[in-house]
Amino acid sequence: MAKSVLKAAPVVVGLTALMERHADALSSQLQAHHLKVFPPHSEKGIRTFGPSEASKLLGVGESYLRQTASEMPELNVSMSPGGRRMFSIEDIHVIRKYMDQVGRGNRRYLPHRRGGEQLQVISVMNFKGGSGKTTTAAHLAQYLAMRGYRVLAIDLDPQASLSALFGSQPETDVGPNETLYGAIRYDDEQVAIERVVRGTYIPDLHLIPGNLELMEFEHDTPRALMNRKEGDTLFYGRISQVIEDIADNYDVVVIDCPPQLGYLTLSALTAATSILVTVHPQMLDVMSMNQFLAMTSNLLREIENAGAKFKFNWMRYLITRFEPSDGPQNQMVGYLRSIFGENVLNFPMLKTTAVSDAGLTNQTLFEVERGLFTRSTYDRALEAMNAVNDEIETLIKKAWGRPT
């Protein structure tokens, strides 16, 4: 008679230990992937631009760009294999400054804020993941900087996807007190906001990175409310307070908000002059946005009653991941326009493999090389992205009272 073989009892692993183990394993693999894509001595950067794209970024005709470039012998412009001039983002930055100095008439080529124009703080938000919130914030910040504005991008999402897109890995490149939390925390370890601002590979675009440390603000705030002293700034005013300290350095601040309604998001809303809500045109996403709007309005009413003051210029809904050939999506877009009217941006951001494939290597459309895609795929994606960002730039100009 064969002896029965006793099977060893399965090892019971605690949930906390299992999640820690998986987090460590995934973190090390992500770091290895980052090093493979961007070796230690390589740097992220914006691709070069031909004369047509460069002239559009500068807001001039190609002939004037050629004439100006010929007047600048110090300009070392690269050449394409076909013999075309290719301009780096640094070249465009230098040319813009030169044009502003020697330009004819009253034409201004540096679009910096002028006397009386208020710093524009745009909070990009949504309650539901997958709406393209971070992709929108990243491309908007880069586009405005490439157009000559002085831009600060703030990653307020503990997942820190915006930081990763800009080359700052949250696990390895962002230390304690190096997120916005360091500048808005309640204790004696608070630092000046200048300490957490870092440069990027685009002239006049700065970043305040994020990581999981931002969650500490959600934990600290209830204690701070209980132990509040006379003169303490409440949670909803802390972001606007520190932004005010560096307002003179920037024209636009773009905040990538967390995908939930916590103290961080409410503070970002209070600091904002404008709100951009991303929405995927499907029923579940729209239902989620309805809950988001209802909860947000209730909470903002409570904050207003507590003394908060809002500096509001505009609020817009951006349709994202839009497929023009999808009938139900077109119906949903029409439904949203019938309810919200002009508060829905005219141009949607299309669903395209160019954006998703660029994201696999933590790059934006302005960074990834056009040659990696079929020309029609890339050009279609870039045209849609530029149309969205140009419409937002127009809203910024209107808020300043400038002609558009």
UniProtKB/Swiss-Prot annotation:
InterPro entries per the record? AAA_dom (IPR025669), DNA_Partitioning_ATPase (IPR050678), P-loop_NTPase (IPR027417), Plasmid_partition_RepA (IPR017818)
Q: Which domain of life is it from?
A: Bacteria
* Its job: This protein is coded by a hairy root Ri plasmid. It is possibly involved in regulating the plasmid copy-number.
SUPFAM superfamilies named among the record's database cross-references:
P-loop containing nucleoside triphosphate hydrolases
Tell me which species this is from.
Rhizobium rhizogenes (Agrobacterium rhizogenes)
Q: Name one GO biological process term.
A: plasmid maintenance
The protein here is known as Putative replication protein A
Alphabetically sorted, this entry's keywords are:
DNA replication, Plasmid, Plasmid copy control
Q: State one Pfam family annotation.
A: AAA_31
